[in-house]
A protein has these predicted regions:
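Internal amphipathic helical hairpin motif
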Residues: 1-29, 78-100
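Conserved, structured C-terminal
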Residues: 33-265
Length: 265
C-alpha cells in the first residue's frame, strides 16, 4: 500500500525502482528494492533515511536497519562492468546477486551501465582500494548530476519532492494497476483530468546556465527550473523545468540574472 508498485510480483534476484507516495500523491522518496528469495533490501536516498524509517514505523512496517553497518558504492561508467567483473560475477541489467562479502545490483542512475555494491563497513576500504588499483577514480555528486541530466533522469529533491507527484515528474511508468496504494485517488485524478504540472527537458544554445529556481516562460505558460547544468558531452546547458500546464510551444525564455535567454524544450 505504501508504494505504487506491486512488490509481490518481483522475481527473485530482481531489482525494482519504485516510489513511496504521500496521501496527497506526492513523492516521499524514490527507492530501489532488491529481491532475494524471502528478503527485500530497500535502498533509499541517504538524505531521506530518517524520513523513510519514520514513514515505515508510522505504518507498522517491521524491518532490520542496516544503515550504520553497511556502505553502498556505485561503480559507474563505460568500463565499470569489465572492471567489477574481475571481482564478482555480473548479473544481467536490473538484476541482483550476492556472495559472502558483496551484495550488489546492476542498476545505476547515471545513464551509464554500472554496479551498486553493498558491503559491511569493515570491507569498504579494501573494496575502494581494489577499485583504485584498477585506476577507477572517485567522484562526487556533481558528476552524478550531469550524468543523470544527460540521461533525463529525475532526482529526488529537485524533480521529485513533497510537492511533485510521479505523474508530474514524468514517472507515470512506475505506477502499476494495483487496486489501491497511498495517494492513488489523487494520482488517478491527475491522469484522468490532466490537471497537473508538467516536467520538460530543455537545452540552451548559449553559455548561460539556467540554475534551479530560474523562472522561465514558454508562450503564455510559466515554469521554474528544477535542475540545470552544463552538459560536458553536449557542450551546452541542459536541464529540467516544471510548468504549470503543458506548453504547446517548444521555445522557452529563461530569466537569468535579468537577461532573457532563449532555449528549446
Amino acid at each position: 500500500y505504501l508504494i505504487c508498485s506491486e512488490l509481490r510480483d518481483i522475481d527473485n534476484t530482481k531489482a525494482l525502482y519504485s516510489i513511496f507516495l504521500s496521501e496527497s500523491g506526492t513523492a516521499i522518496d524514490d527507492v530501489i528494492f532488491w529481491k532475494f528469495e524471502d528478503d527485500l533490501i530497500l535502498i533509499c536516498n541517504a538524505s531521506n533515511t530518517v524520513k523513510i524509517k519514520n514513514h515505515l514505523d508510522a505504518n507498522s512496517i517491521t524491518y532490520d536497519d542496516l544503515t550504520n553497518e553497511t556502505d553502498l558504492i556505485a561503480v559507474q561508467g563505460k568500463n565499470a562492468i569489465s572492471i567489477v567483473e574481475e571481482m564478482m560475477p555480473i548479473p544481467d541489467k536490473f538484476f541482483t546477486s550476492k556472495d559472502s562479502i558483496y551484495t550488489y545490483a546492476r542498476t545505476g542512475y547515471t545513464g551509464e551501465d554500472g554496479v551498486e555494491v553493498m558491503l559491511d563497513q569493515k570491507d569498504t576500504l579494501d573494496f575502494i582500494q581494489k577499485l583504485e588499483d584498477k585506476d577507477v577514480k572517485p567522484c562526487g555528486l556533481g558528476s552524478r548530476d550531469t550524468l543523470r541530466l544527460e540521461a533525463s533522469l529525475p532526482l529526488y529533491g529537485f524533480e521529485l519532492t513533497d510537492d511533485i507527484s510521479p505523474v508530474e515528474a514524468g514517472l507515470k511508468w512506475t505506477l502499476t494497476n494495483k487496486s489501491d496504494y497511498m495517494g492513488k485517488n489523487v494520482i488517478d485524478e491527475q491522469i484522468d483530468t490532466k490537471s497537473h504540472k508538467y516536467l520538460k527537458r530543455f537545452k540552451i544554445n548559449a553559455k548561460q546556465i539556467a540554475r534551479t529556481g530560474t523562472i522561465c516562460n514558454s508562450g503564455n505558460v510559466s515554469g521554474t527550473v528544477t535542475s540545470g547544468n552544463i552538459s560536458p558531452i553536449l557542450g551546452h546547458p541542459i536541464g529540467f523545468a516544471l510548468f504549470e500546464t503543458n506548453p504547446s510551444d517548444n521555445l522557452v525564455e529563461f530569466d537569468i540574472r535579468g537577461n532573457l535567454i532563449e532555449g528549446n524544450l
